[in-house]
Amino acid sequence: MLTITSLQVAYGAKVVLKDISLDVSAGEILALIGPNGAGKTTLVRAVSGTTPVLSGQICVDGRELSELSTAQRAKVLAVVPQARQLGGAYSVEQAVMMGRTAYMSWLGHENERDRAAVQLALKQARLEDFAHRQIAQLSGGEQQRVLLARALAQSTPVLLLDEPTNHLDLQHQTNLLSLVRKLAREKQLAVMMAMHDLNLVSFFADKVALLVDGELKQFGTPQEVIQSGHISEAYQTPVEVVTHPETGAPIIFPKGVWGNGEEK
């Protein structure tokens, strides 16, 4: 379980995250939403340890992350970054092996356990047939799955994703999010991801945190958070929210505009 309590982050004299408290349990997906500059990526970076925290606590299964070394932290949470930070000359297998760095000796020697973890991660990310391909030969969606596999190879209880569907077409977006949801359930991962597409959030998230100007405005289920009033106010854009007849997920569209493209 990932628990964030009274978290504050500042850039210089400016406080950019203000008293954030939320949690995500094993097997759940928490989506961070909000307009540009709301603090979604900052929150992911604060939890991952790449952005310093001004005050507050971040705990994984009761362990305070600020008390852990870098190597210890890498064994409790893994990050799928926003940008595709992969060297094109590496093979897929080599890139995924980087996720085992915290488990290797100081000489960087891999062992059978590392190799087994990498093979399992490749299988879970549906990349077994790509193991010996160079990163540069892969599509954007495939590279995003390599980053996911690298994170899975860390064998952590918490998974963080920063805008994982950016620059992906609809097919790759839904494939990736379906895979993340499947893995969250099967491996009992606590997943937190920053997202822009609110309709995708509605279908794939168990919990939603709405951030505006570094403040947590709403926290709950998609049905509780993704309401026309909350979203219109946060994004400064009037929207309508209807309920999907089969799944019950909220669906958002611009207010006053219907399927024929004409104003109401």
Report residues per predicted region.
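The feature captures the beta-strand-to-loop junction immediately N-terminal to the Walker
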Residues: 33-35
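Catalytic Walker B motif of ABC-type/P-loop ATPase nucleotide-binding domains
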Residues: 159-163
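Conserved ABC ATPase signature
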Residues: 134-138, 142
